[in-house]
Regions:
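Mid-to-C-terminal alpha-helical segments outside catalytic/metal-binding sites
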Residues: 8, 18-19, 37, 57, ...
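Short beta-strand or tight-loop elements
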Residues: 54
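Histidine/acidic residue-rich metal-binding segments in metalloenzymes
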Residues: 2-51, 64-76
Length: 128
């Protein structure tokens, strides 16, 4: 449906982000090698990662590996989440966790991860 609805946005919540680089690489490889089979080229005309970087967001609350691989995960494609009130979350220490995880990142990247990407994904009209 991402091909059919190019403005549709999806978010993978509660899944962290460290797995995304491998899945994107593998999906693109399989698409490249096998797209002529079974009409895949008609259904998915571009590499799968194209749709991810254009329309999909990953969410994380405690993923050092994912943040270490921001270039491949896509700095414009991820959002910090708290996962409150689940037991597998950083609450009530979400603020401290976010500061620990992202304190070394540039301010513009922190803004995107903490607020900017969510604003973009949801089509909101907020200023910094």
């Amino acid at each position: 449906k991402l091909v059919q609805f190019p403005e549709l946005k999806l978010a993978y919540s509660e899944g962290q982000i460290g797995w995304l680089p491998y899945v994107l690489e593998r999906a693109d490889t399989v698409w490249q090698q096998h797209r002529a089979w079974g009409g895949v080229a008609d259904l998915v005309p571009e590499p799968p990662s194209t749709y991810y970087y254009r329309q999909i967001y990953g969410c994380f609350f405690d993923d050092v590996y994912g943040l270490d691989n921001l270039e491949k995960v896509g700095v414009n494609n991820i959002c910090f989440e708290t996962d409150y009130p689940h037991s597998d979350s950083t609450w009530p220490h979400s603020k401290e966790t976010a500061e620990k995880l992202m304190g070394h990142l540039p301010e513009d990247v922190i803004y995107k991860l903490m607020r900017g990407n969510a604003i973009e994904m949801l089509g909101l009209d907020f200023d910094k």
